[in-house]
Each structure stands twice: as C-alpha cells, then as structure tokens.
Regions:
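PAPS-dependent sulfotransferase catalytic domain
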Residues: 80-157
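PAPS-dependent sulfotransferase catalytic core
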Residues: 1-73
C-alpha cells in the first residue's frame, strides 16, 4: 500500500479549492473528506448530537478506512483532503504512518464567519481548530520536524 497524500484542513479554509487543483492534475485518485460522512451519518458517528439523523446502514469508520486502504493499494497515488476532528479517535501511530501529511491553515477570523454564513447553527466541535493544531504538534514531535503548512491566503495572493 502506498502512503496517502493528505491535506489536513478545517472547514471553510479554501481546502476544496486545493482539492480541485489536485483533481485537475489528473495523476491522483482524489477523495473529498472520506471520513466526513461516517462522522455525521455513520453507525458509529461522532458528530454533535444536534446533527445526528438516522445512521447509514453499513457506514462506519472501519468501512471508510478499508475502502481508503484498498484505493491506496491500487496503481494510482491517492490524495485526500480531510479534517482532523473527523479522525482524531483513530490517530494512533499505526494509522498516522499511512499518510504523507501536509496542513492548510486559515485565520479563524475569516473561517468562522464563512462557516456561519454557510451553516448558522454549526457547533464548536465542527470547527476543528484544536484538533488540527493537536495533530500538527503530534506529527512535528514524532517526525522531529514540522510537516509542510500552507496558509490559505497565499493560495489567493
């Protein structure tokens, strides 16, 4: 299995624009927040209670991970854009070793109003800033160097 090229981001950080650029390259299998549906709608979902609807039968974090590993075993490299708060409960060293890590950051003063415009009733647990920072710090400590970080403002400068 090849390691999965991963952009760790938070909602409304211009991460989907980055993902679209990766898709346009045409040389990666690109997946949009593969664990997000399980976080919100999976049988073992972890989203805030006010977000929970009926679970999707058969959708679990394990089923998403199995699919992702199958894709990574294929002939094309895999890129995912993902939010750390969707997977923080999975992030042991063995899990993290499957990825090549990079981070996209955006000033919360820009991200939070954008979230509010899109989802006025969003919960703090959906912002992901604390989880993104915790994952970054953990990886920097593990690797003895910081993973690459892109400031979203640099993408539009």
């Amino acid at each position: 299995m090849s390691r999965i090229l991963t952009l760790w981001a938070v909602p409304r950080s211009r991460s989907t624009a980055f993902e679209q650029m990766m898709r346009a390259r045409g040389d990666h299998v690109c997946l949009h927040e593969p664990f997000g549906e399980a976080w919100y709608l999976g049988e073992d979902r972890r989203c805030p209670p006010q977000r929970s609807g009926g679970p999707t039968p058969g959708l679990t974090f394990a089923s998403v991970w199995d699919d992702l590993q199958s894709r990574a075993a294929g002939s094309e490299p895999v890129f995912i854009k993902e939010f750390p708060h969707y997977v923080e409960h999975l992030c042991d060293d063995a899990f993290l070793d499957h990825f090549i890590h990079s981070f996209l950051i955006r000033d919360p003063a820009r991200t939070l109003p954008s979230m509010y415009d899109k989802w006025p009733d969003f919960a703090l647990a959906e912002t992901g800033f604390l989880e993104q920072r915790a994952l970054f710090d953990r990886l920097a400590d593990r690797q003895d160097k910081a993973p690459p970080v892109i400031d979203a403002e640099d993408l539009v400068a």
